[in-house]
């Protein structure tokens, strides 16, 4: 299951997200609904430029999505199952891991830093997955975990959160994190995101855009 709600999302369509089983089993409903309702910022009686000119405002897509892990979409049998599910229900999108909180990109990335440090695993073929989903009208949202990264923070300890003693800080699960104050960590994430867009992902969802909040004594 999804470990926590998404921290940031590039776009905010009206979205209903039903979480899937991260072990690759059939999806389970979590009844988590996220509806975009941004404030207009207008004072009472004011009208928007579209209303004044008569231009129609573009409607945001209504997305009803399930979350699928990289391992799940790496299975042809499971892809077929979820395509059939989308074709026979109101589901019209899937959230698929680009980089999970295990720190690995789920496919062979061409991003130089990923190649240099080997921070990827062959969980699935993104081109095959995207081709099959898009052929069935399925919108694909790529989930990209940002600072909870126990792999790149070990490969690049200079970019990791440090303890007061100068070593690598670890959360209560013994995992190291990237330091949000280090600009190189932003660039690393953006490069992976740009590659995913070029591959054909329709949207990027950034997760864990923060320090760890579950452990006490962050800098101990």
Task: Go through the PLM ranges and name each one.
Residues 2-61:
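N-terminal, intrinsically disordered, polar/charged segments of Gram-positive cell-envelope systems
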Residues 58-67, 71-73, 147-195:
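Active-site-adjacent "subsite" loops/lids of carbohydrate-active enzymes
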Residues 72, 100-102, 146-148, 208-212:
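Active-site-proximal loop/turn and secondary-structure-junction residues that shape catalytic pockets
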Residues 80-103, 199-203:
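Catalytic domains of carbohydrate-active enzymes, especially glycoside hydrolases
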Residues 93-95, 125-169, 205:
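Glycine-rich, aromatic-flanked loop segments that form ligand/cofactor-binding clefts
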Residues 102-144, 220:
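Aromatic-lined substrate-binding rim segments of carbohydrate-active enzymes
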Residues 107-117, 149-171, 212-220:
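Aromatic- and acidic-residue-enriched segments that line the glycan-binding/catalytic groove
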Residues 127, 171-220:
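Polysaccharide-binding and catalytic clefts of secreted carbohydrate-active enzymes
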């Amino acid at each position: 299951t999804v470990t926590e709600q998404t921290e940031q999302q590039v776009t905010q369509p009206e979205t209903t997200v039903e979480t899937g089983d991260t072990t690759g089993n059939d999806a389970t409903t979590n009844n988590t609904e996220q509806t975009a309702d941004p404030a207009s910022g207008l004072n009472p009686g004011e009208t928007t430029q579209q209303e004044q000119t008569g231009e129609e405002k573009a409607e945001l897509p209504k997305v009803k999505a399930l979350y699928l892990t990289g391992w799940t979409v790496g299975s042809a049998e499971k892809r077929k199952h979820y395509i059939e599910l989308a074709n026979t229900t109101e589901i019209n999108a899937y959230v698929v891991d680009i980089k999970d909180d295990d720190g690995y990109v789920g496919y062979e990335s061409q991003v130089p830093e990923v190649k240099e440090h080997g921070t990827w695993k062959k969980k699935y073929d993104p081109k095959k997955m995207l081709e099959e989903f898009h052929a069935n009208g399925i919108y694909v949202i790529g989930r990209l975990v940002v600072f909870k990264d126990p792999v790149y923070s070990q490969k690049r300890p200079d970019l990791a959160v440090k303890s007061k003693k100068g070593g690598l800080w670890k959360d209560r699960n013994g995992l190291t994190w990237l330091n949000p104050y280090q600009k190189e960590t932003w660039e690393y994430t953006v490069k992976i995101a740009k590659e995913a867009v070029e591959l054909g992902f329709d949207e990027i969802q950034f997760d864990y855009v923060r320090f760890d909040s579950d452990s006490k004594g962050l800098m101990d």
